[in-house]
Amino acid sequence: MSNKSNESSKSSKSSKLSKLSEGEEKKMDDEPPIALNLGCGKNILPSEQGWINVDGMKNDGVDVVFDLDDCRTSPLPFDDDSVSVVLLSHVMEHLHHTLPLMDEVYRVCKSDAKIIIRTPHGASDDAWEDPTHLRGYFPSSFEYFSQPMYWRADYGYKGDFKSEVVNLYIENKVLKDDTNEEIIRKVMHERNWVSEMEAVLSCIKPARKADKQLRSVPRLQILKRGPDLNPEGQNGIGAQGKQMKEVRNDSKDNVVELVD
């Protein structure tokens, strides 16, 4: 067979593969987005909405049994760039190996995928009274899942998530006649004011450089909740309470300003 015939054969084969690839991509675009409920425990979310419930224990409703602390040696059982939403609700504070997990979450997430992380506030008793809690989290903790934060230290972490907003929840029963400024001061400096945090992160691909100048600070929102404000309790993802006041963290030195 001549070189010309070989080239023609290769071109034809390449064209068929290209068409097949385009068809597969279209099929993938038509499929519902994948959403991972990692460390779901008993908080099972509906599969008809695209949720895959993952936990280290095989309980009712768990779709995939996987120990998240195994991410140092075993990959999450999902394809690269396949996931649109990840929920980690009261999981992170229980883990020994946080960065390996976030590396794996980064691998499986599409660009601009949303990651919702809920934890107790590090300055609350809820963060430490449970003997299975290994570490406390604060509003700035989620910035360590971004590459720009590693401008002065390299821990081998390769993922890059931008911390967009951190919701700080206050129970309505603790509020009295405090002014807005007093509430903000107490939230930022006193114990047991914030009962829970909810961070919303975006997956950045390709990853940014480990450059201090690229660091961004999340927007902070203070919200109140209680039986009279949120009778249905937690359900899926998203805000769980009624907004009380919003604060903005515009400085890279973590200065908080009141937004009217």
Which residues fall in each region the model found?
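Conserved SAM-binding loop
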Residues: 33-123
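General secondary-structure edge motif
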Residues: 14-17, 85, 122, 181
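A generic short-segment signal for beta-strand/edge and adjacent turn/coil regions
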Residues: 21-23, 30-35, 85, 112, ...
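Conserved N-terminal segment of class I S-adenosyl-L-methionine
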Residues: 2-5, 10, 16-75, 216-260
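S-adenosyl-L-methionine-dependent methyltransferase catalytic module, highlighting the catalytic core
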Residues: 99-100, 110, 114-260
